[in-house]
Amino acid sequence: MKAEGIVPDVITFAGNGEPTIHPEFGGIIDDTIATRDRFFPDAKIAVLSNSTMLQKEEVFQALNKIEDNILKLDSVLDSRIRQIDVPNSPAFNFESLLKQLCRFNGNLIIQTMFLKGEVNGKSVNNMTEEEIAGWISALKQISPKQVMIYTIDRETPVKALKKATKEELDAIAERARKEGFDVTVSY
């Protein structure tokens, strides 16, 4: 790449699956940092994570070494987290997630997907006043360096889910900005 004049600005771990589940995640990040430092020292390293493995110390330490650890916080309600993110562990809950996110001392980016609709006959809407007020309260505790909000971008396995509108996302972003957060919105 370097010989061809192609220089990456970001090396991103994402895709089909959760990158932090890999048993050698910490070593992979260390190797990536070393390779980046050798060949492309100006490139950032980013990991997009659903936040379900933050309780593993190796995962926490590895994410804290990179420039952009982008961690999901889709709801402050346990029942909604189960609907939206479908965590594997029955013990996964908002309170433990909040504690893990706070451990980063602001060295993280929070990413939240807003949506509404129905899953298995139950209403899903993480844009209610209760949800948004709780989300902003959580952001105040977490103190992320940036907040990214977005909505569904492609076909979902559940047809009854709907995108948040541009107006809804803009209103949520404005509330967070009024609290001092750097917010980016993707429609």
Region roles according to the model:
Residues T165-Y187:
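Binuclear metal-ion centers of metallo-dependent hydrolases, dominated by the metallo-beta-lactamase
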Residues M1-T12, P23-G27:
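Conserved alpha-helical substructure of the radical SAM core
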Residues I21-K162:
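Conserved AdoMet/S-adenosylmethionine-binding subsite of the radical SAM
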Residues M1-K2, R36, A176:
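Conserved hydrophobic residues forming the short capping helix/wall of the S-adenosyl-L-methionine
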